[in-house]
Amino acid sequence: MQRYFRFGALMMLCLLSFLIFADGEAAGKIKAEDFSYQNISLGDSEEALRARWGEPDVQNEQVIWGIHLKTFTYGDIVVSTSATGGKVVDINLIGEKYHLRKDVHYGATSSYLLKVYGKAERQFLDGHTCYVFSHPDHVRERLILNLDAENSALASARITMLPLTDEEADEMALSDDESFVELDLKHSFIASKEIDVSDLPKNDNVKLGGYVK
């Protein structure tokens, strides 16, 4: 009888350990849903943005890493689309009102961020200490969590498919990955290197590197 009791207790302990481990794994993992905000995702069209969020408070244009962008400001949120493709390429969450998955919000502690999104090394980008997480299926899509310099709590968040450094911009420009077509990186790369393309053929089937079939 004692043998059956011990066996049952052992099985219960194993099951409890598995459930605790599974819950920890589920809590500390980046997910595809982390790369959208209020029904707007990277790659959505400008038309979809206006349909879901309405007209912006402010509309402007800017250039980042040679990429021409249109920016739409909704309160403390700035959404950028590629001027070439018209697709959402950057969602910048500033201010103190945003809320992400599992109630991640302004002022959330670093330990809680790692509990929700998993382990990450701190990096320094654009003057901020931050955590950078890549999309589980699209590594060039990133969630950037900027930390407060004094207490390392969450200050702002950014969902982006833009390059993070000049070197990365050049690498993406020379890539054959068609997912970068919205950014018109090849055109930007040529312009930034001051390459004279005036004598190149104007055929639509011409690409950097040769013709396509």
Language model regions located:
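Sec-dependent signal peptide cleavage junction
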Residues: I20-G28
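Bacterial N-terminal signal peptides
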Residues: A9-L19
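Bacterial N-terminal signal peptides that target proteins for export
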Residues: M1-L10
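A cross-family detector of function-defining hotspots
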Residues: A27, D34, D44-T84, H105-K213
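Second-shell loop/turn segments in exported
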Residues: E33-N39, E96-V104
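A low-complexity, Ser/Thr/Gly/Pro-enriched, surface-exposed linker/loop concept
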Residues: K87-Y98, Y106-S111
